[in-house]
Curated annotation (Swiss-Prot):
The reaction proceeds by a bi uni uni bi ping pong mechanism. One of its GO terms (cellular component) is cytoplasm. InterPro entries: Cyt_trans-like (IPR004821), Pantoate_ligase (IPR003721), Pantoate_ligase_C (IPR042176), Rossmann-like_a/b/a_fold (IPR014729). The active site is at H36. This is Pantothenate synthetase. The gene is panC. Belongs to the pantothenate synthetase family. Disulfide bonds: none annotated. Catalyzes the condensation of pantoate with beta-alanine in an ATP-dependent reaction via a pantoyl-adenylate intermediate. PANTHER family: CYTIDYLATE KINASE/PANTOATE-BETA-ALANINE LIGASE (PTHR21299), PANTOATE--BETA-ALANINE LIGASE (PTHR21299:SF1). NCBIfam families: cyt_tran_rel, panC. It catalyses: (R)-pantoate + beta-alanine + ATP = (R)-pantothenate + AMP + diphosphate + H(+). Beta-alanine binds at Q60. The lineage of its organism: Bacteria, Pseudomonadati, Pseudomonadota, Gammaproteobacteria, Thiotrichales. (R)-pantoate binds at Q60, Q153.
Length: 261
């Protein structure tokens, strides 16, 4: 695996290493888990060259503490990527991605950008879309691999690719879960053993619920020691965000299936 630490290094690789070859791209913020690994394996199976980026994007954090406490395990991540035979790791600095500061941003006007996560985390989707556009302009992949857990993010990135005429196919992979139903997330690394017990209780409730009375469901979840930020049903999909201690977790799933593995 070749590691490109800045855009200049990456551009040299892009010109020599990827010419006339199909490129798959998996953008991450590091702290890799099996959800990322599934995306990477799919990318490798469908492309000639697989590129993974690790960049913790400061502009998509509306809470400075969340940014400061986001898990960082770069050396472990590198070992994981090497074991998966990833071709290129793009690991730029903030200065590389925002050389003149955050002067221009994508500001989504879609309804989906202003509800749920958009409402709970002002500026989050603007920062996310801005960095994704930058990464796509740099990597120029044929295929982009995303996880369904970040459902709103996926929908907005699809619109970004369409509206800016980007020649990249967006491929969405199903949410990877633990046996309890808890979705895999980098933030799970910040959960203590006591927090995990609470999370398991929450997902036991979710697996058994029929989602007809969301107020009652909210009360049940809060009784475990978790703190619900929102639970909403849109069309036939359940969206939720909750805190366990100081760790914020999000999820979504179809009403019929629940948070099944």
């Amino acid at each position: 695996m070749i590691i490109a630490k800045n855009i200049e290094q990456f551009n040299l690789l892009r010109e020599s290493f990827t010419k006339d070859r199909k490129i798959g791209f998996v953008p991450t913020m590091g702290a890799l888990h099996n959800g990322h690994i599934c995306l990477i394996k799919k990318a490798k199976s469908e492309n000639d060259v697989t590129i993974v980026s690790i960049f913790v994007n400061p502009t998509q954090f509306n809470n400075p503490n969340d940014y400061q406490t986001y898990p960082n395990q770069l050396q472990q991540d590198i070992q994981i990527l090497e074991s998966l035979d990833v071709d290129i790791l793009f690991n730029p600095s903030e200065k590389d991605i925002y050389p003149d500061g955050n002067l221009l941003r994508i500001q989504p006007e879609l309804e989906i950008a202003n509800i749920l996560e958009g409402k709970a985390r002002p500026g989050h989707f603007s920062g996310m879309l801005t960095v994704v556009l930058k990464l796509l302009q740099i990597t120029k992949p044929d295929n982009l691999y995303l996880g369904e857990k970040d459902y709103q993010q996926v929908m907005l990135i699809k619109q970004l690719v369409k509206d800016f005429f980007i020649k990249t196919k967006v491929i969405v992979c199903s949410t990877q879960r633990q046996a309890t139903g808890l979705p895999l997330s980098s933030r799970n690394k910040n959960l203590t053993s006591a927090d995990i017990e609470i999370a398991n209780k929450v997902y036991e409730i979710l697996r058994q619920d029929n989602f007809l009375d969301l107020e009652e469901l909210t009360n049940k979840i809060n009784s475990t020691g978790a703190r619900t930020e929102y639970i909403q049903k849109i069309n036939n999909r359940i969206f939720l965000a909750l805190y366990i201690s100081k760790v914020r977790l999000i999820d979504n799933f179809l009403k019929e299936t629940g948070p099944s593995c």
